[in-house]
């Protein structure tokens, strides 16, 4: 009985040792780094919207100063007309239809365009301005990427 138990124990230990993955010395591994060219963007369009016009104006001046300090070429600044949302509601729940309330929100929209930037510059710029975005302001970003012509079209 003891021989059976000891043989089971050694069998389990040897199986567990066999299933362990072989250790690899980090010095033996070859570190291969692929050098990829940085992306080029002809324009990065930043659209930001909010309900307070003064906050958007302040954030616009912040964006312009960031572009100036980081020496990023700035394109056009566009202030779009606001979007008005009106929801009529009855004052009381069931009666007196002539007594109504109007709930209204206005969403102000601004667009700023950044011209001729690399991918790393664009990502750093966007990370910085998104960390400093004020409360109640939403942002949408669009990229226009430059790509080389395919080999079938290129002139030799």
From Swiss-Prot:
Signal peptide: none annotated. InterPro entries: Ribosomal_uS10_dom (IPR027486), Ribosomal_uS10_dom_sf (IPR036838), Ribosomal_uS10m (IPR040055). One of its GO terms (cellular component) is mitochondrial small ribosomal subunit. The keyword Isomerase does not apply. It is found in: Mitochondrion. Keywords: Mitochondrion, Ribonucleoprotein, Ribosomal protein. The keyword Lipid biosynthesis does not apply. Its main location: mitochondrion. Disruption phenotype: Induction of dauer formation and larval arrest. Reduced insulin/IGF signaling. Pfam families: Ribosomal_S10 (PF00338). PANTHER family: MITOCHONDRIAL 28S RIBOSOMAL PROTEIN S10, SMALL RIBOSOMAL SUBUNIT PROTEIN US10M. Ribosomal protein required for normal mitochondrial function and normal larval development. Thought to have a role in insulin/IGF signaling. Belongs to the universal ribosomal protein uS10 family. This is Small ribosomal subunit protein uS10m.
């Amino acid at each position: 009985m003891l021989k059976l138990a000891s043989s089971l124990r050694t069998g389990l230990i040897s199986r567990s040792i066999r299933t362990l993955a072989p250790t690899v010395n980090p010095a033996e591994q070859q570190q291969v780094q692929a050098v990829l060219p940085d992306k080029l963007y002809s324009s990065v369009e930043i659209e930001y919207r909010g309900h307070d016009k003064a906050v958007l104006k302040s954030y616009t001046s912040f964006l312009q100063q960031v572009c100036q300090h980081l020496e990023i070429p700035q394109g056009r600044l566009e202030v779009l007309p606001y979007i008005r949302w009106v929801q009529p509601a009855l004052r009381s729940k069931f009666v007196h239809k002539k007594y109504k309330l109007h709930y209204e929100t206005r969403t102000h929209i601004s667009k700023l365009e950044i011209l001729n930037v690399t991918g790393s510059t664009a990502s750093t710029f966007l990370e910085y301005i998104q960390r400093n975005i004020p409360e109640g302001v939403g942002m949408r970003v669009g990229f226009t990427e430059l790509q080389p012509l395919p080999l079938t079209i290129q002139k030799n």
